[in-house]
Amino acid sequence: MVGQFKLIAQTDPHFSQFYAYPLGINPGLAGVNEGDFRANAVFRTQWSQVMTPYITKGVSADIVTPKNLNFGINLLDQSAGDGGYHYQHGYLTIAYSGVRFGEDDNQQITFGIQVGALARKFDPSKFQFGDQWNSITGYEPTASSADQLPRTSSSDLDMGAGVSYADARDRVPVRLFGGFSAFHLNRPQDPFVTQSIAQSLPMRFVLHGGFQWAINERVAITPQFLVMKQGTAMEQMAGISVRTPFAAAADLVAGVNYRFNDAVAPYLGFGFQGLVLGVSYDVATGNLSKTAPGTSSMEVSISYTGRKSGRPIRYLSCPRF
């Protein structure tokens, strides 16, 4: 149980609908949207068929100002498994979007900085250690254990930064988007190791991108990718979505993401006047699906992008789920 807990403690939570939590993948995405303000929420539950589920909830909001400065906030909470573990973070983001070039300055580079707090805690009463087991009577919850971690909670300052590129040209069929970011720049300490060992939380690096291809006036496809590395953990995801109108002011989005050696995640979204509802379901495909069947996950997301009255739409290449 301790080994599993250490793995959880040193890797950040993730979402299959990763663009539904934009500031969690890149502070440089603050204000990179087609409106003047945006709000996102995403809920994920995983492994509920085989154990106490991991539940992850994230919310974010960002605004655009006329001064080439964008501001954002994002909050996340994850309750993980049988150990009573909670991972929480909250960040404020400021981004500069004044680097523009091309015809009519409609290609944009945005730099973002994120500062906030990272909190982790667990309930040691929910752990079962080897020396609490009796060969005759079995597990004895009242028995003390020599395997005690030095701390059960921690709060630390945390920092991240990122850069993104978006294309707002309206007369080209293909528009690129992408970015790079790094998190835990100040290397917060891991509180759940022995006092004789100083170990920092590994930095997390993210590379993401793709393009939007307008096949015609009604149909657009968006291939995309995400690569994340944190310590020895690596996540690679690629996918494609199709967006088409099906009613007045309403869009339908359907697609699939593949997380290499882990899961396939089909998703479906419905958009109406700036509001987007999305749902996805991870079907495990890697070794975990063979050793522990029923380890699938489900996500539900909601996003709203709004504009001030009278301001034109900025057609930035920024996918929404």
Predicted regions and their residues:
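Sec/Tat signal peptide C-region and signal peptidase I cleavage site
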Residues: 5-9
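Sec-dependent N-terminal signal peptides
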Residues: 1-3
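Subset of outer-membrane beta-barrel
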Residues: 10-321
